[in-house]
């Protein structure tokens, strides 16, 4: 098994792996500073299958991480509650995850990385086209999760 130079595959959460937007009244709940939508979000993928693939990628030298935003205009206290809820969701649903980065809403995601993404060509999987474009402008690789995520990830080891 040939290991690659360590690179990180980062996942966004909301709308990428967690179905925040599919919940009834999610926006009203966020505006009311409730964490229920984050706690109750259903996975958007078969997480057993996804985690199996991610653990295989780890054997090839990839690290797995999450970079996720809080809610727009959230207070400090609400951001803390969101962070806690999202971390629990990741622990319950994405055990392959090795890094967790929580950012206030709108923070450029490349600012969460420990290294300069231009060096390692770290990968971001995000449903937001604008976020993917910004990531790529900083030298990273971006994947649209709506375009056969399993196939895209499997190609990283073939």
Model-derived regions, located:
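Alpha-helical substrate-recognition element adjacent to the catalytic core
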Residues: 2-89
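Acidic carboxylate-rich catalytic motifs and surrounding loops in phosphoryl-/glycosyl-chemistry enzymes
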Residues: 67-73, 100-110, 147
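Short amphipathic alpha-helix with an adjacent loop that forms part of the alpha/beta core around
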Residues: 1-2, 111-118, 152-158
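Intrinsically disordered, low-complexity terminal extensions
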Residues: 55-63, 149, 153-158
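Conserved Lys-Pro-Asp/Glu-containing loop-to-beta segment of HAD-superfamily phosphomonoesterases
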Residues: 8, 102-130, 135
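Structural recognition of alpha->loop->beta junctions
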Residues: 86-102
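Acidic, Mg2+-coordinating phosphoryl-transfer loop and its flanking beta/alpha structural elements
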Residues: 120-156
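Conserved beta-strand segments of alpha/beta enzyme cores
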Residues: 63, 98-101, 141
């Amino acid at each position: 098994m040939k290991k690659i130079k360590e690179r990180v595959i980062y996942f966004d959460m909301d709308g990428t792996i967690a179905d925040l937007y599919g919940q009834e009244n999610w926006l009203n709940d966020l505006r009311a500073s409730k964490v229920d939508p984050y706690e109750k979000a259903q996975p958007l993928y078969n997480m057993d299958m996804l985690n199996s693939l991610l653990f295989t990628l780890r054997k090839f030298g990839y690290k797995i991480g999450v970079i996720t935003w809080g809610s727009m205009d959230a207070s400090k206290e609400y951001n803390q509650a969101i962070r806690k809820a999202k971390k629990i969701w990741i622990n319950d649903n994405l055990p392959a995850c090795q890094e967790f980065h929580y950012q206030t809403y709108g923070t450029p995601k490349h600012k969460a990385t420990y290294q300069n993404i231009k060096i390692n060509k770290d990968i971001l999987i995000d449903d937001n086209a604008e976020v993917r474009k910004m990531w790529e402008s900083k030298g990273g690789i971006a994947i649209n999760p709506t375009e056969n995520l399993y196939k895209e990830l499997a190609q990283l080891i073939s």
